[in-house]
Amino acid sequence: MAMEGYWRFLALLGSALLVGFLSVIFTLVWVLHYREGLGWDGSALEFNWHPVLMVTGFVFIQGIAIIVYRLSWTWKCSKLLMKSIHAGLNAVAAILAVISVVAVFENHNVNNIANMYSLHSWVGLIAVICYLLQLLAGFSVFLLPWAPLSLRAFLMPIHVYSGIVIFGTVIATALMGVTEKLIFSLRDPAYSTFPPEGVFFVNTLGLLILVFGALIFWIVTRPQWKRPKEPDSTILHPSGGTEQGARGSMPAYSGNNMDKSDSELNNEVAARKRNLALDEAGQRSTM
């Protein structure tokens, strides 16, 4: 199936990938060149893992996971495969986010620095917890086969909306964290004196993160770029059979079945429409 505005989609996708990749590179250069590198010894070098893993996992990889269903060349792949890729990318992002949080707590504890006192830490921890819950719920309901279509239909809009909200919260938290780190780290020269690290480099990193988030938001909210419903879906009916079978072999009304009441016909049509709606929701259980 051809995608409407395909070249515009490719341009935005390419821009998002470029900006996201630059965000990761800028973060690495920041900690390796300006902040003395990486380590795992409780020092500031361990803390430096926090921005690296957060930008790489919680920002960049999560952004890709959000739009993976909108890649038109994947529409021929099975929905189960795409769900697995979506869940796998989110799982990688979650693991990196958890490791980055551990690095912060270990650094603070070793150096007797208070934990969880800033707005950045509050919002960031809430985002991580909500993300883990979102990942668990999505895996349980949309990837495993046990959940009925009615449950998927009910949870699908919540899953989509909460995913977008969490991603937006992560972008805002990253911007707060970058600013907070600069204020705490830049003493001589101070941040307010326009040092190259802060004004010309890390501020640019913040803008890259913001632009990446905006591009992901735009791509994921365009209805014309949404993965189409699979045409060969099979819908079970209360009376047995499938929607495909019902469409392909409608009963030939003769003298034996012409006496079916209008109410029975209406009930059958209503049940069929209800199952179609549930199937539509179940097939589009992701963004």
Curated annotation (Swiss-Prot):
UniProt-listed Enzyme Commission number(s)? 7.2.1.3
Where on the chain is Phosphothreonine found, per UniProt?
286
Using the record's annotation, list all stretches that form the Cytochrome b561 domain.
15-221
| Reaction it catalyzes | Fe(3+)(out) + L-ascorbate(in) = monodehydro-L-ascorbate radical(in) + Fe(2+)(out) + H(+); Cu(2+)(out) + L-ascorbate(in) = Cu(+)(out) + monodehydro-L-ascorbate radical(in) + H(+); monodehydro-L-ascorbate radical(out) + L-ascorbate(in) = monodehydro-L-ascorbate radical(in) + L-ascorbate(out)
Give the residues the record marks as binding L-ascorbate. 79, 83, 152
Gene Ontology cellular-component annotations:
apical plasma membrane; brush border membrane; lysosomal membrane; membrane
What is the annotated localization of this protein? Cell membrane; Apical cell membrane
Function comment = Plasma membrane reductase that uses cytoplasmic ascorbate as an electron donor to reduce extracellular Fe(3+) into Fe(2+). Probably functions in dietary iron absorption at the brush border of duodenal enterocytes by producing Fe(2+), the divalent form of iron that can be transported into enterocytes. It is also able to reduce extracellular monodehydro-L-ascorbate and may be involved in extracellular ascorbate regeneration by erythrocytes in blood. May also act as a ferrireductase in airway epithelial cells. May also function as a cupric transmembrane reductase.
Q: What is this protein called?
A: Plasma membrane ascorbate-dependent reductase CYBRD1
Query: Which organism is the protein's source?
Result: Pongo abelii (Sumatran orangutan)
> Lineage of the source organism?
Eukaryota, Metazoa, Chordata, Craniata, Vertebrata
